[in-house]
């Protein structure tokens, strides 16, 4: 139900204003999820929400605007440099609206043709695994290291290698959360 509410809310937001900034779209999404689940009512027993990221690309200017809530964006340059753009600490839609300092902030990111971008959910980074008897989370550093090793590869190849690395890391352990990875190049 939450996925459908988010999808319909985003459609509503962008139908009203196709040029809405990613940070403003996330704030509207926060409100629409909270009210759509009636979590704005004092007697509400529900307290559900989501994490999200939105990217708006300006191909003419070779830039993108990114805003995320509990989701970041990795930028792999052609020279192999990996930059991590961190999203805000807030989540969307919960009964308690985000504090002012946790509101999503749009980041403008310049890119060169061929650069690759990766967005992963916390299900990817938080998955315990590894070869040790005491499993540890996949983490952000492991993604950064893998991306730097994959310099020059296509988005499809990087997506495939991320999936392989994640599955190997997870091993026989149970998956703890939904896992999403979006990989694209510009």
Residue ranges with predicted function:
Residues 7-186:
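Conserved subregion of the PPM/PP2C metallophosphatase catalytic domain
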Residues 1-4:
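Conserved long alpha-helical elements within nucleotide-processing catalytic cores of c-di-GMP signaling
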């Amino acid at each position: 139900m939450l996925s459908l509410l988010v999808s319909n809310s985003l459609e509503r937001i962008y139908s009203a204003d196709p040029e809405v900034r990613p940070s403003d779209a996330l704030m509207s999404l926060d409100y629409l999820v909270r009210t759509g689940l009636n979590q704005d009512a004092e007697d509400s027993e529900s307290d559900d929400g989501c994490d999200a990221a939105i990217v708006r690309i300006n191909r003419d200017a070779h830039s993108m605007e990114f805003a995320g809530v509990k989701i970041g964006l990795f930028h792999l340059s052609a020279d192999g440099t990996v930059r991590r753009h961190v999203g805000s600490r807030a989540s969307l839609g919960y009964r308690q609206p985000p504090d002012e300092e946790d509101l999503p902030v749009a980041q403008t990111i310049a890119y060169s043709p061929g650069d690759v971008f990766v967005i992963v959910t916390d299900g990817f980074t938080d998955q315990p695994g590894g070869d040790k008897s005491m499993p540890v989370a996949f983490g952000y550093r492991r993604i950064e290291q893998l991306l730097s090793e994959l310099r020059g590869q296509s988005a499809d190849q990087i997506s495939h290698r991320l999936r392989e690395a994640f599955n190997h890391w997870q091993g026989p352990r149970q998956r703890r959360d939904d896992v999403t990875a979006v990989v694209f190049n510009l």
